[in-house]
Amino acid sequence: MEFQYRGNKTVLSNCYQNPPLRASRPLYINPANRSEATVYLVETSGGIVEGDHNVFDIDIKEGADVCLIPQSATKIYPSYNGIWSSQDMDITIGPKASLSFKTEAVIPFEQARFNSKTVIQMTSDSTFLWGDILSPGRVARGEVFEYTDVRTNFQVWMDDECLIYDPLLISKDNMGLKKMGMLEDHLFIGSMWFVTPTIEEFDIRELNERLQESPHSKASASMLEGKAVNVRWLASDLVDLKKEMNRIWDEFANYIV
């Protein structure tokens, strides 16, 4: 997908899509920024099946503002033959452009093996807001950390220098997830990244104080080299976690405006 700023709004100037991946037409629904293009990302097959490899290539040109929203949680089906499912996202954010990627969950089913890599290339005057949740499985069916392996690698490069390198590996057979210093009694891992040119003005201490007020999760925020804010959550209820993450998301989004 390619986005450009034309005629006082951001347009989807190029979109090549191959089933089961689909992108909606741009919507202009942000009352705070009517030029921002909101696009829904749809997985028409209902999930990533064993051996599937999903690829997203997103190029946001200078001055364009984009919000991408997954239509639903990403479901990872079992890998009965031990073959990994994978997803790669390569994103470029041009000068004075912005991308907001709305929070949604990844749900690995029993015996799933999933590898995800996300690489964002941006400039020092562009803006980036990202949220994601890793679920322990289909909790309502009693699947809690029954998947085999999940690997994620999240990178952000600013002006060709690595600003964020955030790998995660959860392998239930090789980790004591309930041990102290691991997940303990929590089930869900939430993460949010916010990068914007004026981030140094953000009050990280005040944000941390408010994060501690939530009775439903453990959370903490940190400032990275005065260029990015990262917030992490551990929670046992997905609904409560989403509410808390959406609240912080809205705060960051308003800060952009």
From Swiss-Prot:
This protein's name: Urease accessory protein UreD
Pfam families, per database record: UreD
UniProt keyword terms in alphabetical order: Chaperone, Cytoplasm, Nickel insertion
Originating gene: ureD
Transmembrane segments: none
HAMAP family (UniProt xref): UreD (MF_01384)
Localization in the cell: Cytoplasm
Organism: Sporosarcina pasteurii (Bacillus pasteurii)
Major localization listed first in the record, in broad terms: cytoplasm
GO (cellular component) term, any one: cytoplasm
Reported function: Required for maturation of urease via the functional incorporation of the urease nickel metallocenter.
Domain of life: Bacteria
